[in-house]
Structures are given as structure tokens and as C-alpha cells.
């Protein structure tokens, strides 16, 4: 009697703790089935397809809604909780990890595409072009990246990014200019028949989208400042800590809707795709990209984690399953960030002082999957054009793909723009980016999964490397009440019956009956 009852309790506990994950998996399967059936047996108009995907659109809007408060509150509280020297060390370790894994991903992608040669058996004319090629200047894109790191208006940075465009100056424009015009004039030589120079003026514009890079830079500095202000800054620390907790409560509500939204996202995308024949034409190219992403996520990242942390990396990855599924469905590292926080902190028990500092930065600059994809795509397009790349050009692709992926968050319409930058760096025709746009929506989902997994492993690795500094801060927090994550020991109800440390809601939680000063960590 005892054993069946215990098995029943274990099953109920498993379902209770993993109902969201299981329902998401079921939603993915149902979404694929419904999408295929609707595509085969109904003839929906473009308007009908738009309405069909509406529940999925609502999920995306809700997730994007919490990105801004989550990034701002988590970055500020995370940095304020750390000593400036400690935060510098943690930041350096995180950036080194991001840089090394991105370089490894690029090298892996180039090795695979050079070995498999997916573009050798095909010609440019055999593949249909989709979309248009954006006009991109590498210099302007890099300068825009730096400009966006230092926004001139903090409120505007919450919904717009700075972007420069070039406009050709004609003779009539030149005579009509007045003294109040603020645009900068640049002169460049172009290959025209008269072999004359053309004049361009650089015009600054703003495009829609959160300036994540600028907000992170500001929050980093702001968090360091209020962390050093002592008791004067404590009220701000408490405010942003409460904002972070409130945002995560909202995330819990959103995740209850997630299975339904994901079902319609998947089904809607399957119905929307016009030409499935393109997948056959670009099949070998897709296999090359997916093979690289699989090797990087299943072999390289877990190996790095195991070498540093000395724990089972696949158990850690299992704790991130919900975040990885979300990334696969919605194809956005930033929109997945709320789920990534929950998985890292509640499933894998990573220190909040690490996750709140490392994850927002990782979601912005750590793009292993994107770097690998861009390197493979550049060499693939070179093979389509029968262009033999030299060692110098391959190195150029590697460096450019790494830099472009790191700076992608600070560049408006980053996907196409960064790809054009990589192609232009080695003299490949920028318009050939339209050859791979048709399958980009699918590959983008898988490379987002790799990006999120890399961020997650990064928190575990940085936490291990920073263990000594965190323990020293735990000791000093007994006399330093400024730390918003002052240590409280909590016994976690798990099978190991070990006493683990939980960083809960601030250093003033003395009376646990006080709902304002004490908040329990919620579970899935």
C-alpha cells in the first residue's frame, strides 16, 4: 500500500512542478498538427491567416510588455547588490565567457560549411530571391551602435533607437540648404560613368524598438552609483527590487497563457509559409547551420560548463527547458528573458546577484547562434558565386561575424543589417542576402535557442568562478544592510534535504509575517 501511494504522490508532485512545461510541449505538437491540417484542407485568405494567428500575437505582446521593467529593475538591483570591485570582476568574467563562446561558434560554423560545401552544388540563379536588400554602411552601423550606447534621452530610449541614413545631395539641394540644417555632409567616391564624386549627407533618424544597449549602460552606471550611496540610495534599491518582484509576478500570470499562445504561433506560421519548395533547394545549407547549432549546444557549451563547474550540464539544461521551448517558439532572446530568469533562479537555483547582472547583458550581446549562422551564410553565398575565399577573407568573416553578433542589439533591424555587414566585409554582393531570407524565420528560432542556452550556462559558470567573492559579500552583509539580497537561509523542500541559501527580497526580512518585507520564492 505504501509504495503505490508514494508513487501517486511523486506523480502528482511532478505534474504540479512541470505542468507548464508539459502543456507547452503538448501545445507545440497540437500547433504543428493544426497548422498542417488547416493548410491542407482549407483555403484561407491573407486576412484569415492574420486573424488565425491573433492569440499568438497577444502572447508576443505580453512578453514584450515586461522586457523593459524587467531589464531596468534587474540590472539596477543586481549591480547595486554587488561591490564595485566584485561587479567589475563578474562583468569581466561574463564578457570573456561570451566572447570565447562566440569565437568558438564562428570557428565551428566555418569548419562545417567549408567541409560540407552546401553551396558548391548549386548556383545563384537556381534559388529564388525573397525580400529586399537594406542599404547599409558598415561605418555608420558601428557608429550607430556606439551612439545607442549613450542615448541622449532616457525616455526615448525606452521605445526608439537611433539610426543614420545617407541621402544623396543634388545641386538643387545644395543651393537650397539653410543655416539651420543639422545634418552632416559626407563626401564619398562612387563608381559612376563620369567618375565624379557624389556628395551624401548623413541624416539622423529614430526607428521603433527598445534601445536595450543604451538602457543597460545607464542601468549599470546607475546601479553602481546608488550602491555606493549607502542609506541614501537604499530607498531606490528597495523600489527597483520591489519592481523586479512585481514584474516576475506578472510573468507568472503571462506564463499561464503561454501554451495557448504558442499553439497559435506555430499553427499560424505553418499556414503563413507560401513556398515549401525553398526548403528542398536550401536543404543542405539548413542542415549545415542546424548541425553547427546542435554541436555547439549539445557538446561545446555543456563541456565548458562541466570543466568549470564540475556538475552535470544536461541536468542544468533540463532546468532551462521551459525557457528553451519559449525561445524556439517566439524567436527572441529578449522576449524570452522573463522565462529565463524564472528557470535560472527557481529551477537551477542560480544566485540572483548573478542572474540579474549577467542575463540582461547576455540577452543583448551573447549571440553564439547568430554568429555561427552569419559565418555559415557568408561562406555559403561565396560558394554559390564560385568565389574561392582566402585565409585572410575567412578570418575577416570570423571577426566581422563575431563583432556583428555582439553589436546586433544596438543596430535597428539587426538581422539583415548585420548579415549585409558580413557580406560587404569580404566583397560579396549584398543583394545575395535575399537568397536565404526565405528560410531565415525557421533558422532564427533554433539559433535563438542556442543564444538562450549560452546565456543560461554563463550564469552557472560565472557563479562558480565568483563563489569566493559572493561568500565574502555574504559575510560582510551581516553588517552592511545596503545589500538588497542580504542572505536569508531557507530550507528548500527537495529530495536532497540539503539546506540551500535563498536570496529573498532584501535584507530587512525579520518578521516573516509581514507581507511587505518578506516574499517567498514561487515555484513553477
Curated annotation (Swiss-Prot):
Tissue expression as described in the entry: Brain, but also small intestine, kidney, liver and heart.
Membrane-traversing stretches: 19-38, 62-82, 94-114, 206-229, 239-266, 287-308, 354-380, 441-462
Glycosylation-annotated residues: 43, 178, 195
Protein's membrane topology: Multi-pass membrane protein
Keyword Cell membrane carried by entry: yes
Record's subcellular location: Cell membrane; Apical cell membrane; Synapse, Synaptosome; Early endosome membrane
Intramembrane segments: 314-344, 394-427
Binding, Na(+) 2: 364, 405-406, 408
Family matches, as PROSITE patterns: NA_DICARBOXYL_SYMP_1 (PS00713), NA_DICARBOXYL_SYMP_2 (PS00714)
Reactions listed under catalytic activity: K(+)(in) + L-glutamate(out) + 3 Na(+)(out) + H(+)(out) = K(+)(out) + L-glutamate(in) + 3 Na(+)(in) + H(+)(in); K(+)(in) + L-aspartate(out) + 3 Na(+)(out) + H(+)(out) = K(+)(out) + L-aspartate(in) + 3 Na(+)(in) + H(+)(in); D-aspartate(out) + K(+)(in) + 3 Na(+)(out) + H(+)(out) = D-aspartate(in) + K(+)(out) + 3 Na(+)(in) + H(+)(in); K(+)(in) + L-cysteine(out) + 3 Na(+)(out) + H(+)(out) = K(+)(out) + L-cysteine(in) + 3 Na(+)(in) + H(+)(in)
Keyword Glycoprotein: yes
Residues the record lists as Phosphoserine modifications: 517, 522
Topological domains annotated Extracellular: 39-61, 115-205, 267-286, 381-393, 428-440
Origin superkingdom: Eukaryota
Keyword list, A-Z: Amino-acid transport, Cell membrane, Chloride, Endosome, Glycoprotein, Membrane, Metal-binding, Phosphoprotein, Potassium, Sodium, Symport, Synapse, Synaptosome, Transmembrane, Transmembrane helix, Transport
GO cellular component: apical plasma membrane; early endosome membrane; late endosome membrane; neuron projection; plasma membrane; recycling endosome membrane; synapse
Quaternary state and interactors: Homotrimer. Interacts with ARL6IP5. Interacts with RTN2 (via N-terminus); the interaction promotes cell surface expression of SLC1A1. Interacts with SORCS2; this interaction is important for normal expression at the cell membrane.
Domain notes: Contains eight transmembrane regions plus two helical hairpins that dip into the membrane. These helical hairpin structures play an important role in the transport process. The first enters the membrane from the cytoplasmic side, the second one from the extracellular side. During the transport cycle, the regions involved in amino acid transport, and especially the helical hairpins, move vertically by about 15-18 Angstroms, alternating between exposure to the aqueous phase and reinsertion in the lipid bilayer. In contrast, the regions involved in trimerization do not move.
Database matches in PANTHER family: EXCITATORY AMINO ACID TRANSPORTER 3 (PTHR11958:SF109), SODIUM/DICARBOXYLATE SYMPORTER-RELATED (PTHR11958)
The protein's name in its UniProt record: Excitatory amino acid transporter 3
Organism: Oryctolagus cuniculus
Amino acid at each position: 500500500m505504501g509504495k503505490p501511494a508514494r508513487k501517486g504522490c511523486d506523480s502528482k508532485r511532478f505534474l504540479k512542478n512541470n505542468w507548464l512545461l508539459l502543456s507547452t510541449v503538448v501545445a507545440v505538437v497540437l500547433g504543428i498538427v493544426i497548422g498542417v491540417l488547416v493548410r491542407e484542407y482549407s483555403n484561407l485568405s491573407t486576412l484569415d491567416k492574420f486573424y488565425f494567428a491573433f492569440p499568438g500575437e497577444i502572447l508576443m505582446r505580453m512578453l514584450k510588455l515586461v522586457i523593459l521593467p524587467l531589464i531596468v529593475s534587474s540590472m539596477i538591483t543586481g549591480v547595486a547588490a554587488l561591490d564595485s570591485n566584485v561587479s567589475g570582476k563578474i562583468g569581466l568574467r561574463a564578457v570573456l565567457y561570451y566572447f570565447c563562446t562566440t569565437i568558438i561558434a564562428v570557428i565551428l560554423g566555418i569548419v562545417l560549411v567549408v567541409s560540407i560545401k552546401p553551396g558548391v552544388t548549386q548556383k545563384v540563379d537556381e534559388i529564388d530571391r525573397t525580400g529586399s536588400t537594406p542599404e547599409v554602411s558598415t561605418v555608420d552601423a558601428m557608429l550607430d551602435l556606439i551612439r545607442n550606447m549613450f542615448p541622449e534621452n532616457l525616455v526615448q530610449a525606452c521605445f526608439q533607437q537611433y539610426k543614420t541614413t545617407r541621402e544623396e545631395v543634388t545641386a538643387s539641394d545644395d543651393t537650397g540648404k539653410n543655416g539651420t540644417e543639422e545634418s552632416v555632409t559626407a563626401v564619398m567616391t562612387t563608381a559612376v560613368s563620369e567618375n565624379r564624386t557624389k556628395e551624401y549627407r548623413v541624416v539622423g533618424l529614430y526607428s521603433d524598438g527598445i534601445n536595450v544597449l543604451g538602457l543597460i549602460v545607464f542601468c549599470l552606471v546607475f546601479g553602481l552609483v546608488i550602491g555606493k550611496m549607502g542609506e541614501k540610495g537604499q530607498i531606490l534599491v528597495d523600489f527597483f527590487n520591489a519592481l523586479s518582484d512585481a514584474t516576475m509576478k506578472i510573468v507568472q500570470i503571462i506564463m499561464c497563457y503561454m501554451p495557448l499562445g504558442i499553439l497559435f504561433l506555430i499553427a499560424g506560421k505553418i499556414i503563413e509559409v507560401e513556398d515549401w519548395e525553398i526548403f528542398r533547394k536550401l536543404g543542405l545549407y539548413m542542415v549545415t547551420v542546424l548541425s553547427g547549432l546542435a554541436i555547439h549546444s549539445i557538446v561545446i557549451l555543456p563541456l565548458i560548463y562541466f570543466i568549470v563547474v564540475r556538475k552535470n550540464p544536461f541536468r542544468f539544461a533540463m532546468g532551462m527547458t521551459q525557457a528553451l521551448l519559449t525561445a524556439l517558439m517566439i524567436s527572441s532572446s529578449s522576449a524570452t528573458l522573463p522565462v529565463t530568469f524564472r528557470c535560472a533562479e527557481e529551477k537551477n537555483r542560480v544566485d540572483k546577484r548573478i542572474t540579474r547582472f549577467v542575463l540582461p547583458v547576455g540577452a543583448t550581446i551573447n549571440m553564439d547562434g547568430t554568429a555561427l549562422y552569419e559565418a555559415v551564410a557568408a561562406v555559403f553565398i561565396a560558394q554559390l558565386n564560385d568565389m574561392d575565399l582566402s585565409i585572410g577573407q575567412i578570418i575577416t568573416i570570423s571577426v566581422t561575424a563575431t563583432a556583428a553578433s555582439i553589436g546586433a542589439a544596438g543596430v535597428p533591424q539587426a538581422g539583415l543589417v548585420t548579415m549585409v555587414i558580413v557580406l560587404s566585409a569580404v566583397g560579396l554582393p549584398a543583394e545575395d542576402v535575399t537568397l536565404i531570407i526565405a528560410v531565415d524565420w525557421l533558422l532564427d528560432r533554433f539559433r535563438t535557442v542556442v543564444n538562450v542556452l549560452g546565456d543560461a550556462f554563463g550564469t552557472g559558470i560565472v557563479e562558480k568562478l565568483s563563489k569566493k567573492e559572493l561568500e565574502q559579500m555574504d559575510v560582510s552583509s551581516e553588517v552592511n544592510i545596503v545589500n538588497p539580497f542580504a542572505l536569508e537561509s531557507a530550507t528548500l523542500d527537495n529530495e536532497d534535504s540539503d539546506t540551500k541559501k535563498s536570496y529573498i527580497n532584501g535584507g530587512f526580512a525579520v518578521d516573516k509575517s509581514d507581507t511587505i518585507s518578506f516574499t517567498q520564492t514561487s515555484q513553477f
